[in-house]
C-alpha cells in the first residue's frame, strides 16, 4: 500500500502520512517535499527518538535541492505499538525496505539513504543484505558496537528468547547527545521520545552491529561514515573497525570528529557546521560522479 502524500499544511509544518507494513503494523511518515528537487533522501532515526527531530537537517537538504522523507520506526514516535518492541528480530530491516521502495516508487530517481545511530545500523545492514540499493549511503554515529559488557550482550541474547519484549530502560545519557544544551533540554522535554528498549531489540543491535563489521568489505555502494570520536552513547571503535574492513571495497569515505558528541547534526557550533561542510562536500562529489 502506497503512502498517500498530502500537500504541505498551511501552518508550515511538514506533511504526514501512514504506511502499512506486511504484518499490519502502521508506520508514521513525515515529508519535507521540494518542487523540482534534484534528488531525495530517506532518513532513519535512532533509538528512543523520532523523525520529527530531523526538521533542521531536512531544511538543510531542502536548501540544497533534496526532498526528504523520514519515518518513525516501529516502537518509536507516533508509530503505535510497544515502545522499543519488535515482533521479529528483523522487523526494522523489513520496515526500512518497505518504506524505501514505497518512497522510491514516487520519485524519478531512487533516494539516498541516511541513518543515524540505531538507524545507521538499520540502514547499513539493509544495504549489506541487498534489501535496498540506494545510489549512496550516509551513516552518522552508527550503532555498530556498544559500550555494554560482553556479559550484558550475552544476557540480551538469552532474554530475547525467553522474554523478548520485557520493557527495560535503555540507559541513554542525555547529556552526551550534544554539547548544545538547548538540544539536550529539548530532547528531555520531547513528548515523543522514550527511554525504553526490549531484549529482542537489544539483541538485534548487538548482533547485527557485529554482522555489519564482519561484512563491511562487501560494501556495494558509495558511503559516507561520520564518526564522533567523543561519542558516549555508541562505541566509535565499531565505526573504526567497519572503516578498516570496508577500505578494500573502495566505496567508503570516513570523517572523524575528535571532540564531538553523538548527535553530529545537532552539535553546538562550530562543530555542526564542520560536519555539514563535510556532508556537502561529499554530496557534491557524488553528484559529479553521477554525471560522468
Functional labels for PLM-detected ranges:
Residues 114-198:
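Alpha/beta-hydrolase-fold enzymes
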Residues 1-21, 25-34:
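An N-terminal hydrophobic leader/cap segment in hydrolases
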